[in-house]
Amino acid sequence: MNSKPCPDCDGGGVVTRREFLKTSITTAAAAAAAPLVLPGSVAGAGAKAARSETIVATLYKDLSEAQRKAVCFPFEHPLRSKVDNNWHITDKKISEFFNKDQQAMIKEIFLGLHSPEYAQTVYNQVEHDGGNAGGFGGTSIALFGEPGTGKFEFVITGRHCTRRCDGDSVAGAAFGGPIFYGHAAKGFDEKPDHPGNAYWFQALRANEVFKALDGKQRELALLGDARGEKGTDTVKLTGKKKNLPGIPMTELSRDQKDLVKKVMADLLAPFRKADSDEAMKLIEKNGLDHLHMAFYKNQDVGKDGVWDVWQIEGPAMVWYFRGDPHVHVWANIKAKA
């Protein structure tokens, strides 16, 4: 990511709370895709769409001093780069600590981080998996730095949720740092076909790659035990171009490589275009031929030969899909390890 300040988050790009509340915020995916339009007095000629970063700036300005003390931290605070599968970055639930207007802003920020096609599906997943803790309202947020200074990041966390909104403040990191998503659609222990799971389509696409491999290639790709889940260390980058787990892309034909690219497209599909484009740019910069893809037979739910656990790893990226007993997905993509 570029380290330059985000123009939408500087003074002229901050929509006021009153102006924000004049816009319609709905739960539909179409609304998630529809940008908030700033009045001409704020946006200037040819009013431009407000991004999630702009709403973060509006939210920041609307916080009381007591709220800032609880959820705002220096930009370099270590919590900013943490990721886990079920955690709260602060002990302040959205539904209890923020007023209704602020809750609406937080929801809009979250929706805006995702693509129009998947925003509502992803929101529903967080709402479902956070059910016992209050659904989406049971998540928590933190803001690091200050919008408009060139160094800030908004982080939202909960069960099966770590997302970031950084306005390009975190240089060389897709999504502003490591992210996590997951789903336990029909219970903690999902059936082999993971019915209703929001992200299982990604594993089905990955299994198309395995089906296209010949016997020798499968020997390279199919391994025993996958990596453990260890919080932020789960997606620790190695910087290695060779001898990573699984089959290197150099061992694949052009058609097989095209299938891997389709997997990458599906992995990035739930996220807003700016983030997915940047992620792919960083991966390509480090060399697609340095990627390795691995499948893990010891965590095959239902023993059906459809691999529930797999990963793609390169010198400065890890995308780890763990579908046993339900879906956990960890991702970390940088310019360099």
What are these regions (language model features)?
Residues A33-L38, F210:
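Short intrinsically disordered, low-complexity segments
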Residues G46-E65, K69-A337:
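A cross-kingdom marker for long, charged
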Residues S24-A32:
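Sec-dependent signal peptide hydrophobic core
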